[in-house]
């Protein structure tokens, strides 16, 4: 039985979507068990304990923006969920709680993979090509970075793509404001030079990539400092939502456009579904000794479903064991 520890207290939408997604996941995956960590009085409004849903009663949640020193000094639903993995009572931890607190607790309790200085947040993105995705790391865990972080993340991302997507030599690039070697900050330039000269067997390093090119499907792994990566993440999320609204407004503005929209309705629906970030559901805390996934604070049931599906693929591909072996 594979066990997931799920901190259900951090979601903006309450515990409901998290619990309902958990129920549906274990119904469809009979070899999985989920430990729901949170306020039992809230959780039991949706589900009672059974052989594959267990409840740990810990109502105290980490508040967004809470002082890290205070977070680390007390017991919360987030810390309990991570402790379950640390104590080998679960294999995976999932939370939609405060990002900074989650990262800090994961690093302190689960420890870093050997050779990794700073873990990163790593979401998976769709591209304009069917069945083609890429990972972007970091997207906010490390605002200030050193050259070695970018080099390490390139290796982490390439190993992830190799394991999860069965790509022999993933295409890797560093996010920058231009593709020329002299562009960017010193750490961009140095990491670019190191990766070019290293000619590593686990990746096909292609140099710098500009933000406008990341959705074309030419890269499997894109490395960024946390500040730039977070801007890209939020820009992409916002663009998809706003573009969908724009299309809907334009195609329903006249009678004839509405007729055309009916013909194209299926295509529009497929595009929207293809670009819906909820299908992925979360970002990895990549670089720690266990599978740790951070769901978006605004996650609904569909987003949690996406996170569970991502976790299932990772567990069944023995991602952490492969990381340790390859790195």
Curated annotation (Swiss-Prot):
Q: What class of enzyme is it?
A: transferase
**Swiss-Prot/TrEMBL keywords:** Cytoplasm, Lipid biosynthesis, Lipid metabolism, Phospholipid biosynthesis, Phospholipid metabolism, Transferase
- Matching InterPro entries: FA_synthesis, Phospholipid_synth_PlsX-like
Q: What GO MF terms are annotated?
A: phosphate:acyl-[acyl carrier protein] acyltransferase activity
Q: Name one Pfam family in it.
A: FA_synthesis
Q: Where in the cell is it found?
A: Cytoplasm
Catalytic reaction list: a fatty acyl-[ACP] + phosphate = an acyl phosphate + holo-[ACP]
Report the EC number(s), separated by commas if there are several: 2.3.1.274
Query: Chief subcellular site?
Result: cytoplasm
Pathway membership, UniProt: Lipid metabolism; phospholipid metabolism
Gene Ontology terms describing biological process: fatty acid biosynthetic process; phospholipid biosynthetic process
Per the UniProt entry, the disulfide pairs are none
Query: Which cellular components does GO assign to this protein?
Result: cytoplasm
Q: How does it assemble?
A: Homodimer. Probably interacts with PlsY.
Q: Which PANTHER family match?
A: FATTY ACID/PHOSPHOLIPID SYNTHESIS PROTEIN PLSX, PHOSPHATE ACYLTRANSFERASE
Family of the protein in this entry: Belongs to the PlsX family.
Function according to Swiss-Prot or TrEMBL: Catalyzes the reversible formation of acyl-phosphate (acyl-PO(4)) from acyl-[acyl-carrier-protein] (acyl-ACP). This enzyme utilizes acyl-ACP as fatty acyl donor, but not acyl-CoA.
Q: Please state what the protein is called.
A: Phosphate acyltransferase
């Amino acid at each position: 039985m594979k066990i997931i520890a799920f901190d259900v207290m951090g979601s903006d939408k309450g515990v409901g979507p998290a619990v309902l997604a958990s129920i549906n996941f274990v119904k469809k995956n009979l070899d999985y068990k989920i430990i729901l960590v949170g306020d039992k009085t809230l959780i039991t409004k949706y589900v009672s304990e059974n052989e594959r849903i267990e409840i740990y009663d810990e109502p105290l949640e980490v508040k967004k923006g809470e002082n890290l020193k205070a977070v680390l000094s007390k017991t919360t639903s987030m810390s309990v969920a991570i402790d379950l993995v640390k104590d080998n009572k679960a294999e995976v931890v999932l939370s939609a709680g405060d990002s900074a607190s989650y990262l800090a607790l994961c690093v302190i309790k689960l420890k870093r993979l050997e050779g990794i200085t700073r873990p990163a947040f790593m979401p998976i993105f769709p591209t304009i090509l069917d069945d083609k995705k890429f990972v972007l790391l970091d997207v906010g865990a490390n605002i200030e970075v050193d050259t070695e972080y970018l080099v390490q993340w390139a290796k982490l991302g390439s190993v992830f793509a190799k394991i999860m997507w069965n790509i022999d030599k993933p295409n890797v690039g560093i996010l920058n404001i231009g593709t020329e070697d002299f562009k960017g900050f010193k750490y961009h330039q140095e990491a670019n030079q190191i990766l070019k000269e290293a000619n590593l067997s686990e990746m096909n390093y292609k140099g710098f990539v500009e933000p406008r090119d990341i959705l074309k499907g030419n890269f499997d792994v894109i490395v960024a400092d946390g500040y730039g990566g977070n801007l890209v993440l939020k820009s992409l999320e916002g663009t998809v939502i706003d573009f969908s609204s724009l299309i809907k407004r334009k195609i329903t503005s006249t009678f004839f456009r509405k007729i055309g929209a009916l013909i194209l309705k299926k295509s529009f629906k497929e595009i929207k579904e293809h670009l819906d970030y909820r299908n992925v559901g979360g970002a990895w805390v990549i670089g720690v000794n266990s599978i740790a996934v951070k769901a978006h604070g605004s996650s609904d049931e569909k987003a949690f479903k996406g996170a569970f599906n991502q976790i299932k693929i990772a567990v069944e591909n023995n991602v952490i064991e492969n990381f340790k072996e390859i790195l």
